[in-house]
Amino acid sequence: MATTHLDVCAVVPAAGFGRRMQTECPKQYLSIGNQTILEHSVHALLAHPRVTRVVIAISPGDSRFAKLPLANHPQITVVDGGDERADSVLAGLKAAGDAQWVLVHDAARPCLHQDDLARLLALSETSRTGGILAAPVRDTMKRAEPGKNAIAHTVDRNGLWHALTPQFFPRELLHDCLTRALNEGATITDEASALEYCGFHPQLVEGRADNIKVTRPEDLALAEFYLTRTIHQENT
């Protein structure tokens, strides 16, 4: 059985640009209220007492991060990220010190709820593999014909989940799985897929569907609505 109540290091890959946002500014530096999306995402992690450090992987040419209050935060370490998400996560893991467990969270996912985070972190008490926040698929899913915008067939949504973040794993296990998957040319779309590639089966922890990732222009207003609602609920 896993050890309980260990301090956790979080890794936030923030070296991407996000061209689908159609802005010159990387999406993690767009503002919601008086903070950037990145700040909202990081503060949600640090709000939990078990998260004692956050490692943020930024682009080597990033000049925006140094202007944020996060740059001088005592619990934050900054490292150079890589060309791909997995490279940035590996750079973050190397800076995570001797942390036994690590969270990986999207820089552009600012609406994380504390109850979801707490339930995910509880996996360290029962699991040796870890798991991810995820939401059951609710919509009818269609598969397109190859190379066409035409329906091939309807996909059975039973058992389908939307993968969210944070994702939570033993540090050494995640490091080894990411390294092997990259060395063998596997397609890695999130951290859990690296563990899957190596034969592990992380847990699915149901999280709120409003834990959205800001990817397209219309997501910004939706994230602002969710954050404003959460702040209002916490203050009433």
From Swiss-Prot:
GO biological process, one term: isopentenyl diphosphate biosynthetic process, methylerythritol 4-phosphate pathway
Site feature (Transition state stabilizer) residues: 20, 27
SUPFAM superfamilies tied to this protein: Nucleotide-diphospho-sugar transferases
Pfam families (alphabetical): IspD (PF01128)
UniProt protein name: 2-C-methyl-D-erythritol 4-phosphate cytidylyltransferase
Catalysed conversion reaction: 2-C-methyl-D-erythritol 4-phosphate + CTP + H(+) = 4-CDP-2-C-methyl-D-erythritol + diphosphate
Gene: ispD
Listed EC numbers: 2.7.7.60
Keywords annotated in UniProt: Isoprene biosynthesis, Nucleotidyltransferase, Transferase
Cited InterPro entries: IspD, IspD/TarI, IspD/TarI_cytidylyltransf_bact, ISPD_synthase_CS, Nucleotide-diphossugar_trans
Recorded family membership: Belongs to the IspD/TarI cytidylyltransferase family. IspD subfamily.
Subunit details: Homodimer.
Pathway involvement of the protein, from the record: Isoprenoid biosynthesis; isopentenyl diphosphate biosynthesis via DXP pathway; isopentenyl diphosphate from 1-deoxy-D-xylulose 5-phosphate: step 2/6
Cleavable signal peptide: none
Entries under Gene3D superfamilies matching the protein: Spore Coat Polysaccharide Biosynthesis Protein SpsA, Chain A (3.90.550.10)
Main function: Catalyzes the formation of 4-diphosphocytidyl-2-C-methyl-D-erythritol from CTP and 2-C-methyl-D-erythritol 4-phosphate (MEP).
Residues the UniProt record annotates as site (Positions MEP for the nucleophilic attack): 157, 213
GO terms assigned for molecular function: 2-C-methyl-D-erythritol 4-phosphate cytidylyltransferase activity
